[in-house]
Every structure is written in C-alpha cells, then in structure tokens.
Regions:
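Basic, flexible Lys/Arg- and Gly-enriched helix-loop patches that mediate nucleic-acid binding at interfaces
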Residues: 1-138
C-alpha cells in the first residue's frame, strides 16, 4: 500500500510498502518527515510570500501550516519542503499568499531523492540504506 499519497494532479515520489509499521512511522505527523516538491506558479514569487510561508501560515478557515523551507529556482518556480501532509497543503498555502500552483512534483522524502532515471509511472525497489534515508533529518 502507498505510504502517503499525491493529489491527482501532482507527480513524483510515491513510496509503496508492505511494512505497515514503517508506513505509520513515516506518515505520523509527530515524526515530521520532510517532503520536498518542485512548484511551478502562475505569478512571480514575492519575497513577502516566501517570508510568510517560511514562518508558518494560518488560513482564514483556521487551518494552520507549520513553517516550510523555500528555495527559489526561478521567478515562477521554487522548491518547498514541508513536514506535514494536509489536504492540498501546498496549493492552499500558495493560494493564501495570492498565487496559484500550476505544476507540483514531489522530488524527495526525508533525505531520499526521487530516482531521476525513472519516468512517470515507473518504479523500482529501494535499498536498505535508502529506506533509512527516508526517516533521517537533514
């Protein structure tokens, strides 16, 4: 079964496992496993938006998101690292700062990067060392 999920229009890293205990451990919010995404946006990324997202943001409906880490890649593209996994989290966060996500791809879980040799829909087994990397902090 999948350890975590992606929205229907998000691509990238999905971990499938038969180890329920491991899946629970990496999915549990108390363990704060980092997940990194490449985000393409409709509009340029504003400094104020980066600051708000990096400090944590609360939506009008009261939903609070923990601080995220953002690395600017270009005017309309960034990497964002979050440790939660709330419903449509990244899309909702960027909407709250006046922008819209046009493409979203998960590239990393914990310290393990998505294997760039894999095309969408392909999979491979991970090694024991890679498995450990998922639950390790940077």
């Amino acid at each position: 079964f999948p350890a975590g999920r992606l929205d229907k229009d998000t691509t990238g890293f999905v971990l499938i496992t038969d180890d329920g205990e491991f899946a629970h451990r990496i999915l549990s919010p108390k363990n704060h496993i980092d997940k990194t995404y490449v985000v393409s946006l409709r509009d340029n990324i504003e400094e104020e938006a980066v600051s708000l997202l990096e400090n944590g943001i609360t939506l009008r409906d009261g939903t609070a998101f923990l601080p995220s880490k953002i690395k600017i890649l270009s005017d309309k593209e960034c990497e964002i690292t979050i440790c939660e996994g709330k419903y449509h989290q990244i899309k909702r966060m960027f909407c709250a700062v006046g922008n819209e996500v046009t493409n979203l791809r998960r590239i990393k879980m914990g310290r393990l990067f998505l294997d760039e040799r894999l095309r969408d829909g392909e999979c491979r087994e991970i090694t024991a060392d890679e498995l450990k990397m998922i639950s390790e902090k940077e």
